[in-house]
């Protein structure tokens, strides 16, 4: 039995430690994959580990969000081994409750059956899909499954084995239709409650304003929260979900005190058996809907003699780290999930996979900005997929197509230079051409005749392995004055509060639209009940990290002086010295921001979530504004002990980072600062 405390990364690390790392001399390079949904990062990973796209299909790919957990692959000799960690029971129950609620709401609104089923079987975040676990009635009702494919490939040779018998299909369909009937009954009761509430509030349903509809929807949610039939349905579905673990060998499972699986591990010398087994946790193969455990998985780590088919020498020593796509964000200043940014420190290379047909849109630019602000841009490797789709009357020949893509990258670098300085722009531009590769048709097996792509893939591995070449000691020491830090903190915290007041509808800010109250409520539950620091694209912890890091990065870009002398503005040594400190700051900011916004405010987030009844949306928003002001007060504008302590913690964080990174901070010592506070 394992303890209830849950850290999936630590559990996987205990079973199957990652080689490589900052101080390792084992020749391994760690690669973190980052990219937008559908750009092809998992497809590139497939090429690097040599899994067959038609027969093995590991990891799974599709046009939608497919990689919904962390995946780590170690290329090493010996047996094939794997460890899988699972999402805790309480969080799965909440996902189920949100799916059932969405289905009931859609039924009340008069949506057709197909839409009600979709709401029930696919969570709005598209990361939790009950259809994988319980099956899909629309597919189960079909007599011919010939068109059910794992992915969007044109050809599928040697289809994945179907695990489900006709008898089991019938049982799955019967269970789903029972759940849908209960959802319909709950919707009927809720609609009657809605009509009664509307009459009491003198609201005409057909002409209700948005504000009135929100009030009525919240009343329905409150009614369901008190309905025993609603909770009984959720519990029944959760029990059905838990039954899927019975298909696993008990000897390979370890569970928490409540009996819910925490980890599963497996080892074999048989590659085919290993791939078939591990696909139960990562597959999206439609004929096996009803048996797949994919949505319950938090992370997968595998190791074995994987190798690229086209690599002609000894298998490269690689650790490949994949995760959820960064999404299609609308603004390059948007925050990346902490699930992405907290992994930067573990990587030797950070591979940004982008679509060459639409290069350097908002999301990839947000990655570049984050890497520059955090001092990790020297780890960047750019892989442009879909190079075969880059076409135009003015793009004749490979060189012209490359120039077109590189031009987009140069524009992005120049835009970043305007915010972060000429040195940051130059550090990005130095990556061309050595750190940029172009890939065509990598979703298929790469044939010998595809000489261009084979050359680029081989070059990609060479580039990755070059990132572990030892760097000499920093020769220059930047010197800073702590007095110049206050303005940076003021600007960052002011922007943080302005942004979140706009999101909460408590003020207006250009480019920030108020979020629907249901999403705000869901965020407070994630923060309070599950200690998860985000809900979909609502990321208060990541926002605070990004805004503080951006302003502190600009502070660090302009040292007061240097020792022993001032390096030239375009010197790589200058940027290396500053980036070393930025990395230290970025790592510490993750801990500070999570502690102040989440861990010290758990009871406040629970209280904000639990508000019910008319006017609760406004009360919740006011609570959140207060929580944010306590967590990140604006220096000199929000006076009091909270503001003093916050500024002290940031100054201490910067001081530790500067000293650890080889620099010097004037005007700072804990003793002097504490004596000022006491006086």
Give the location of each predicted region.
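Non-catalytic alpha-helical scaffolds
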Residues: 1-72, 77-360, 369, 374-379, ...
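Acidic/histidine-rich, metal-coordinating catalytic segments
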Residues: 385
């Amino acid at each position: 039995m394992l303890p209830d405390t849950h850290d999936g990364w630590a559990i996987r690390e205990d079973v199957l430690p990652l080689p490589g790392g900052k101080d390792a001399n084992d020749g391994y390079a760690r690669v973190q994959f980052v990219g937008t949904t559908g750009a092809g990062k998992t497809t590139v990973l497939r090429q690097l580990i040599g899994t067959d796209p038609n027969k093995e299909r590991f990891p799974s790919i599709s046009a939608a969000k497919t990689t919904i957990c962390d995946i780590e692959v170690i290329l090493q000799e010996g047996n094939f081994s794997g460890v899988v960690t699972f999402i805790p029971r309480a969080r799965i129950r909440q996902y189920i409750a949100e799916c059932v609620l969405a289905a009931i709401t859609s039924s009340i609104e008069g949506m057709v059956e197909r839409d009600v089923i979709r709401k029930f079987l696919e969570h709005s975040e598209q990361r939790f899909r009950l259809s994988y676990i319980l099956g899909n009635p629309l597919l189960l009702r079909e007599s011919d499954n010939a068109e059910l494919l794992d992915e969007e490939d044109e050809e599928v040779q040697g289809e994945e084995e179907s695990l489900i018998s006709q008898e089991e299909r019938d049982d799955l369909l019967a269970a789903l239709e029972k759940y849908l009937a209960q959802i319909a009954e709950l919707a009927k009761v809720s609609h009657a409650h809605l009509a009664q509430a509307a009459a009491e509030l003198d609201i005409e349903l057909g002409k209700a304003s948005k504000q009135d509809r929100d009030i009525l929807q919240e009343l329905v949610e409150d009614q369901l929260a008190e309905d025993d039939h609603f909770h009984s349905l959720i519990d029944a579905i959760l029990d059905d979900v838990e039954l899927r673990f019975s298909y696993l060998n008990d000897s390979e499972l370890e569970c928490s005190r409540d009996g819910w699986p925490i980890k599963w591990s497996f080892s074999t010398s048989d590659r085919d058996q290993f791939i078939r087994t591990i696909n139960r946790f990562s597959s999206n193969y439609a004929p096996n809907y009803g048996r797949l455990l994919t949505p319950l998985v938090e992370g997968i780590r595998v190791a074995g003699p994987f190798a690229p088919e086209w690599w002609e020498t000894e298998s490269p020593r690689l650790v490949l780290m994949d995760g959820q796509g960064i999404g299609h964000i609308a603004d390059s200043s948007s925050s990346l999930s902490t699930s992405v940014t907290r992994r930067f420190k573990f990587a030797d290379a950070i591979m940004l996979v982008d679509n060459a047909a639409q290069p350097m849109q908002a999301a990839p630019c947000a990655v570049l900005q984050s890497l520059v602000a955090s001092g990790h841009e020297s780890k960047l490797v750019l892989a442009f997929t879909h190079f075969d789709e880059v076409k135009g009357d003015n793009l004749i020949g490979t060189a012209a197509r490359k120039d077109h893509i590189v031009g987009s990258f140069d524009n992005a670098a120049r835009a970043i230079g305007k915010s972060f300085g000429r040195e940051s722009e130059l550090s990005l531009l130095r990556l061309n051409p050595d750190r940029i590769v172009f890939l065509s048709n990598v979703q298929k097996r790469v044939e010998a005749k595809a000489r261009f792509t084979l050359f680029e893939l081989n070059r990609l591995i060479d580039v990755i392995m070059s990132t572990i070449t030892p760097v000499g000691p920093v020769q220059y020491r930047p010197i800073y004055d702590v007095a110049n830090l206050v303005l940076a903190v003021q600007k960052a915290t002011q922007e943080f509060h302005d942004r979140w007041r706009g999101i909460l509808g408590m003020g207006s800010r250009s480019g920030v639209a108020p979020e629907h109250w249901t999403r705000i409520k869901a965020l407070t539950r994630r923060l309070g009940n599950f200690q998860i620091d985000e809900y979909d694209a609502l990321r208060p912890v990541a926002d605070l990290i990004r805004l503080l890091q951006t302003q502190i990065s600009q502070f660090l870009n302009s040292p007061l002086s240097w020792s022993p002398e001032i390096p030239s503005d375009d010197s790589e040594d200058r940027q290396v010295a500053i980036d070393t400190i930025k990395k230290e700051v970025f790592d510490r900011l993750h801990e500070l921001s999570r502690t102040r916004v989440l861990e010290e405010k758990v009871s406040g987030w629970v209280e904000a979530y639990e508000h019910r009844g008319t006017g609760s949306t406004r009360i919740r928003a006011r609570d959140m504004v207060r929580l944010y002001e306590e967590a990140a007060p604006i220096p000199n504008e929000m006076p009091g002990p909270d503001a003093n302590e916050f500024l002290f913690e940031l100054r201490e964080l910067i001081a530790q980072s500067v000293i650890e990174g080889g620099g010097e901070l004037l005007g700072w010592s804990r003793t002097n600062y504490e004596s000022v506070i006491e006086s």
